[in-house]
């Protein structure tokens, strides 16, 4: 290591300069969570000589900025005045200074922010510089940026909305105190606070004039995101739980928030509103506990042309299908549509269940196995063959149909499946001869 250091361009550096470094510099370095691969470099007085020897592309300045090491940044500047030939990983390039500023703002290192501004960084170059410190709650950095003239109200108070969404209560209060409008963009800040689930901010914004009555169903927003306390908050304010054809209940059901569903039903929400949308949407999204509750409340399982079971079959929710069937859902409707869609999607457990319950797997000219083959769902196809379907029947009509309709890669996979199943090359040859006529 010593021989390597002799040829290093930093050997000529005045050693007195190292010895004159403030002790707190090394304390900061030792206590900073910087990547272990350069810890030695950060704690050795031959710091930049070691950085020069590093083969990694580690950007020392970037790490120093991220970790708030203001002493390192000042040291780099001081070194540059003595020798500008040091490693590219320790150069303070003005072309990168704006990126460094963005990171310093994001991580809340006020001293670094001020230093970079002093070095020429333009704190007003991008309005988005505010986003990082606001969403991460770095209030002092935001105050400094505002004092430097950064526009905190751009895009109709976008920063206030960001703070509300992220739950930065103190930031919200500060922005309101210096002039942000809680009602901008049709009370959108309040909507974002509801979405984020921050009831303290919701209450504060309303106290400052945000009008929840001008929002398109604030209760539904809270239900959609599962924020029970905000649901109760708006119920206490006499918001109509049945507004927009019971949208609040539908949103809670679709997103699986059972406790909210029960709460709204207890308050009188209509489970069968809009063609029993609550059970339809909860079935489509796979929320078994909500489906079971709604069934116990006498929801119509066959509403809107058997929507609930159709979509459960499409998505592959076996438990929900069983629950619906046991509660009277029609599963043979529309020429055994449920079986056909499950076969094409490859949902083997559903296919088996429906066949065992009596679904006709040969309906519509054996549509189920044709759908399975064309979608390369060969486990389902094998099961249906075991149930009695024969691809060789009717001059191999099923096989010819699938080969004709499929892409070349799918054709090859179907051919392999047929050969593995019947071990008959002539079967394949005759099929191709027929479909190419």
Swiss-Prot record:
Domain of life from the UniProt record: Viruses
Entries under PROSITE patterns matching the protein: ANK_REP_REGION, ANK_REPEAT
Database matches in Gene3D superfamilies: Ankyrin repeat-containing domain
One Pfam assignment: Ank_2
Entries under SUPFAM superfamilies matching the protein: Ankyrin repeat (SSF48403)
Alphabetical keyword list: ANK repeat, Repeat
ANK repeats: 56-86, 96-125, 127-154, 156-184, 185-213, 214-243, 244-273, 275-303, 305-333, 334-363
SMART domains given in the database record: ANK (SM00248)
Keyword match Methyltransferase: no
PANTHER family tied to this protein: ANKYRIN REPEAT PROTEIN, GH09064P
Descriptive protein name: Putative ankyrin repeat protein R787
Organism: Acanthamoeba polyphaga mimivirus (APMV)
């Amino acid at each position: 290591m010593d021989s390597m250091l002799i040829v290093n361009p930093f050997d000529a550096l005045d050693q007195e300069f190292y010895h004159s470094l403030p002790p707190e510099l090394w304390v900061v370095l030792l206590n900073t969570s910087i990547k272990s691969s350069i810890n030695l470099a950060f704690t050795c007085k031959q710091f930049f000589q070691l950085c020069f020897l590093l083969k990694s592309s580690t950007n020392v300045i970037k790490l120093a900025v991220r970790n708030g090491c203001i002493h390192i940044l000042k040291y780099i500047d001081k070194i540059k005045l003595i020798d500008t030939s040091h490693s590219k990983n320790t150069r303070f390039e003005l072309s990168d200074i704006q990126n460094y500023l963005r990171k310093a703002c994001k991580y809340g290192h006020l001293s670094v922010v001020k230093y970079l501004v002093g070095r020429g960084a333009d704190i007003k170059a991008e309005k988005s510089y505010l986003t990082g410190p606001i969403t991460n709650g770095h209030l002092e950095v935001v105050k400094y940026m505002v004092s430097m003239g950064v526009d905190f109200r751009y895009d109709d108070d976008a920063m206030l909305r960001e703070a509300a969404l992220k739950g930065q209560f103190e930031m919200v209060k500060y922005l309101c105190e210096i002039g942000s409008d809680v009602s901008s963009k049709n009370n959108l800040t309040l909507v974002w606070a509801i979405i984020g689930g921050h009831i303290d901010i919701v209450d504060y914004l309303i106290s400052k004039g945000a009008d929840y009555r001008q929002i398109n169903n604030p209760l539904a927003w809270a239900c959609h995101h599962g924020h029970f306390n905000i649901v109760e908050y708006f119920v206490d304010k006499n918001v109509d739980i049945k507004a927009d054809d019971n949208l609040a209940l539908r949103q809670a059901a679709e997103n699986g928030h059972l406790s909210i569903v029960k709460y709204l039903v207890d308050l009188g929400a209509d489970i069968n509103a809009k063609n029993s949308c609550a059970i339809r949407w909860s079935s489509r999204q796979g929320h078994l506990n909500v489906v079971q509750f709604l069934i116990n409340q006498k929801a119509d399982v066959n509403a809107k042309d058997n929507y609930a079971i159709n979509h459960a079959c499409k998505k592959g929710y076996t438990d929900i299908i069983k629950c619906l069937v046991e509660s009277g859902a029609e599963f043979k409707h529309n020429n055994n549509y449920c079986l056909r869609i499950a076969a094409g999607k490859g949902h083997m457990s559903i296919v088996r269940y429906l066949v065992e319950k009596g679904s006709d797997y040969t309906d519509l000219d054996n549509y189920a196995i044709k759908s399975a083959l064309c979608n390369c769902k060969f486990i389902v196809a094998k099961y249906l063959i075991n149930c009695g379907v024969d691809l060789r029947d009717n001059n191999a009509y099923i096989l010819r149909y699938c080969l004709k309709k499929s892409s070349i890669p799918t054709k090859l996979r179907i051919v392999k499946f047929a050969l593995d199943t019947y071990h008959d090359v002539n079967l394949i040859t005759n099929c191709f001869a027929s479909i190419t006529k």
